Design a protein with these regions (language model features):
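Short, conserved beta-strand segments within well-ordered enzyme catalytic domains
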Residues: 1, 33, 68
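Detector for Asparagine
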Residues: 3, 24, 45, 59-60, ...
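Compact nucleic-acid interaction/catalytic patches
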Residues: 10-15, 20-55
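C-terminal terminal-subdomain/extension
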Residues: 56-106
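GIY-YIG nuclease catalytic motif and its immediate N-terminal context
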Residues: 1-10
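Hydrophobic alpha-helical segments
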Residues: 6, 15, 95-96
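Short, flexible segments with low predicted structural confidence
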Residues: 5-6, 40, 66-67
Length: 106
């Protein structure tokens, strides 16, 4: 869970689960690059930067969700509240592919 408030404009807000996408190898900065998780909506099936996650015992989500890679941001480690789960290798690979789409890296 990550506290994403306060925000400005269309930034995603409130305390919510997120996927940390930055590498631990960069450990010198007190920041993490995160992608927030939000509720699934059928219209997201055609949005290339939304990666669907189904709830399971590894990610510990309680409902069908999506990782919103268009809302990538760096946050202070002080915003990280607790670790609630992980994504699997296949899911993380899909997240990395969606990140490439956001940055135009094909």
């Amino acid at each position: 869970m990550v506290n994403l408030s306060p925000t400005v404009g269309a930034e995603i807000t409130k305390t919510r689960p997120c996927v940390i996408v930055s590498s631990n190898e960069i450990g010198i900065l007190p920041l993490k690059v995160i992608a927030p998780i939000t509720d699934y909506k059928p219209r997201y099936n055609t949005v290339p930067w939304m990666v669907e996650l189904s709830p399971d015992g590894i990610n510990n989500l309680t409902k069908r969700s999506v990782v919103d890679l268009f809302q990538l941001r760096s946050v202070s480690q002080g915003r990280l509240i607790k670790n609630t789960g992980k994504v699997g290798k296949d899911e993380f690979q899909r997240i990395l592919e969606a990140t490439k789409i956001v940055f135009g890296i094909y």
